[in-house]
């Protein structure tokens, strides 16, 4: 008997009809001889609606109370799915994140899972029940306060539970039926991938793929939890994410796909003194404010005045805050200026095949040249090339790269709804 953890996104649970459809799938999995644990996101746009409601009551709501409010969304869908399963003649028991033993750090709004002690879930499984766990939430061990896990928290909940329960597979259900070589809404002939290594999926998640959040893939890799990305609208087996890139034979290594990201902003510090410790001051101030940095470029030092320019990208949502911090440092450091640009986007090519295929970088650059796309920043890893370009050029760049590396097929991809959640 296998133990299967299934996670259903908000689009899969946005109405009573879809909840019943999900319940039928869950019961079918149980009848096939599996133990089943289900992690639910909030229904449809419930989380956004709760955020709007909170803002109407208090423009700056306390973080603790916001977490109390937002976790209600998952508890609602949790109970409804359990009810739907019971109506089909199967036994189900729902759990909040804290009841399921999801223990987190104290940070409200973006807590991290530190441990999972799923004793009550195991007991219910031993009794033959289907266990339904509210995603996106946990509890801090010291304060006992409810916490939320941030964007994609339900994916992370599912993977963490799968690891703690030693599950055979963690299935992530949404409105897409797998991981594609590109976003089918941008590249219509994008092809679904049957299998990816953890490293390839980590790179795709890090550079903009919305199918799985980075934290969930990191967790899966750390605990070797096989992931399967599937659609709740079809019976297609989807994409399996498992194993290491090192296990892929050299002759089978390929280029995996193209991803785009519109969530970043570019910040440039002009005229900063080019001496030890100056760049460290910039990035320490941003780190203390918990602002993540992605791409970084430092220009060659000016011989005349001993200064240089530093350009980096950060989440657009943190861009204004980063500027406020750096403007204060500008006065202390006597920098020339600090510039902000949020009309940029990142396009990336990922694949284990880069290690064994010389010339990939040249072809990448030539493909963008041929569609008149200018490159502003470049970042690479062993299996990835990313460039920062104008946001308006992203779609054309993605299509050009997809065609250049022959990643497409003859048929158009099936898009059930399109959000990937």
Swiss-Prot record:
EC number(s) stated in the UniProt entry for this protein: 2.7.2.4
Effect in UniProt of substituting residue 364 to A: Change in the inhibitory profile and shows an different oligomer state upon addition of threonine
Highest taxon in the source lineage: Bacteria
Impact reported for residue 301 to F: Absence of inhibition upon addition of threonine and lysine or lysine alone
Residue span, ACT domain: 267-343, 349-421
Disulfide bonds: none
Regulation: Feedback inhibition by lysine and threonine, but he enzyme is moderately inhibited by lysine alone, and threonine alone has no effect.
GO cellular component: cytosol
Pfam families: AA_kinase, ACT_9
GO biological process, one term: lysine biosynthetic process via diaminopimelate
Catalytic activity entry: L-aspartate + ATP = 4-phospho-L-aspartate + ADP
Enzyme class: transferase
SUPFAM superfamilies: ACT-like, Carbamate kinase-like
InterPro entries attached to this UniProt entry: AceGlu_kinase-like_sf, ACT-like_dom_sf, ACT_Aspartokinase, ACT_dom, AKii-LysC-BS, Asp/Glu/Uridylate_kinase, Asp_kin_monofn, Asp_kinase
PANTHER family for this protein: ASPARTATE KINASE, ASPARTOKINASE
Family: Belongs to the aspartokinase family.
Quaternary structure annotation from Swiss-Prot or TrEMBL: Tetramer consisting of 2 isoforms Alpha (catalytic and regulation) and of a homodimer of 2 isoforms Beta (regulation). The dimerization of the beta isoforms is stabilized by the bonding of threonine.
Protein name, UniProt field: Aspartokinase
Lineage start: Bacteria, Bacillati, Actinomycetota, Actinomycetes, Mycobacteriales
């Amino acid at each position: 008997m296998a133990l299967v953890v299934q996670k259903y996104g908000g689009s899969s649970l946005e109405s009573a009809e879809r909840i019943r459809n999900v319940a039928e799938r869950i019961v079918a999995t149980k009848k096939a001889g599996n133990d089943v644990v289900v992690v639910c996101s909030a229904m449809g746009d419930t989380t956004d609606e709760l955020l709007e409601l909170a803002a109407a009551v208090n423009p700056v709501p306390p973080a603790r109370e916001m977490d109390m409010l937002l976790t209600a969304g998952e508890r609602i869908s949790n109970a409804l799915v359990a009810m739907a399963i019971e109506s089909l003649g199967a036994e189900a028991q729902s759990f909040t994140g804290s009841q399921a033993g999801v223990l987190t750090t104290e940070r409200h709004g973006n807590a991290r899972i530190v441990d999972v002690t799923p004793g009550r879930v195991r007991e219910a499984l031993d009794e033959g029940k289907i266990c339904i766990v509210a995603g996106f939430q946990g509890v801090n061990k010291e304060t006992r306060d409810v916490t939320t896990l941030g964007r994609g928290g339900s994916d992370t909940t599912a993977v963490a539970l799968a690891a703690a329960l030693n599950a055979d597979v963690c299935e992530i259900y949404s409105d897409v039926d797998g991981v594609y070589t590109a976003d089918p809404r941008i590249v219509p002939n994008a092809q679904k991938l049957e299998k990816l290594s953890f490293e390839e999926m980590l790179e795709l998640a890090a550079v903009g793929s919305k199918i799985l959040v980075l934290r969930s893939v990191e967790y899966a890799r750390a605990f070797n939890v096989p992931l399967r990305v599937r659609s709740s609208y079809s019976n297609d087996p989807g994409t399996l994410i498992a194993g290491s890139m090192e296990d892929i034979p050299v002759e089978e290594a390929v280029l995996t796909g193209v991803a785009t990201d519109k969530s970043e902003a570019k910040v440039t510090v002009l005229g900063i003194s080019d001496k030890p410790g100056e760049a460290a001051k910039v990035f320490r101030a941003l780190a203390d404010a918990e602002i993540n940095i992605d791409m970084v470029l430092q220009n060659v030092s000016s011989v005349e005045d001993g200064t240089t320019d530093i350009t980096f990208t950060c989440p657009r949502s943190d861009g204004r805050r980063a500027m406020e911090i750096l403007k204060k440092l500008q006065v202390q450091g006597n920098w020339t200026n600090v510039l902000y640009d949020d009309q940029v986007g990142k396009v990336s090519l990922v694949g284990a095949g880069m290690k064994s295929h010389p010339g990939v970088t040249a072809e990448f650059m030539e493909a963008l040249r041929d569609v008149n796309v200018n490159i502003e920043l470049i970042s690479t890893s062993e299996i990835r090339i990313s460039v920062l370009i104008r946001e308006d050029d992203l779609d054309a760049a993605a299509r050009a790269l997809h065609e250049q590396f022959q990643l497409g097929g003859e048929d158009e991809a099936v898009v059930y709804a399109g959000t990937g959640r």
